[in-house]
Amino acid sequence: MRLFVALAPPADVLTDVDAALGPAREVQPDLRWIPVERWHLTLAFYGEVPDESLTGVIEMVARKLSRRPLPGPVELSFSGSGQFSRRALWVGVAGDVDRLRALAKSVNTDRRPYRPHLTVARLRGGQDATRAAEVLSSYAGPVWRAREVHLVRSFLGPHPRYETVSSWPVTGPAPES
């Protein structure tokens, strides 16, 4: 099974991003636009994991999160846009990005630097999403609080879908004043 750890932004925030994509979809309708119900903010990608290892992965994520709880809420917003190597069009993340990186680092097994983003479209064979990225470059969405971290299973195929396997609160106790 394919597993990843992610945040699920609130529905109203995703609706705002979706509305902002309208002009980008008009200038580049040929991109493979990802449906809103599959949008998430990936923290760590574990890839293929044997079914019998699921309990161990759940325990590992829980242990890692408990070792590095973030005090107080993590406030984020989506802002700007870009593309990754002609593979994906993304909307950027603003706000408590350093804390988001710390959260990602706590569950990540990959050594590459974490680049927070919301993938909104995939590109086919060398496509360039520059026009769509330019349209979205000035986007600044509403602020939202990350409340839960989710371990998610992805099912590939003609109709990909996601299933939340387990969830944990993002934060530890709020700091005392």
Q: Model-found features: residue ranges?
A:
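Histidine-dependent nucleotide/RNA phosphoesterase domain, centered on the 2H-phosphoesterase fold
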Residues: 1-177
